[in-house]
């Protein structure tokens, strides 16, 4: 797999942190050294949805270059939680990444799980939004979902979106 890296950003391969059975693992860092996204392959996933939360889909884009068995994954930036809180306890309230799962519908959604089908099982490329890590303009005391919406309009987010949506197989 290959992707387009924003100027002045770097990729770090944290040696020794691969999934059992191999795979790739890379951290993408901005010029200040902050981790903006991670790419991992050969991920074994499983989840259950025992509780749902209010959500908002802030941005999506289809990624046909990553289609597997007729399923076209999507880039998504989405939130979970209530307007006045940073999200459910122990669950990140906003994240951006690639997903093969269906986008939420109805008034509530399961916690964010950004994984996509990739041989031999699945992969991930994305991160959770953190206003302490992601350069977000405006009043830092705004409710968390509002900060995520403001972040969506930044140049940093545009770079992240362009980088993640550029992911493609090397052989194609």
Q: What are the functions of these language-model segments?
A:
Residues 1-102:
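Secretory pathway targeting signatures of secreted, lumenal, and periplasmic proteins
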Residues 77-172:
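Short, well-structured beta-strand
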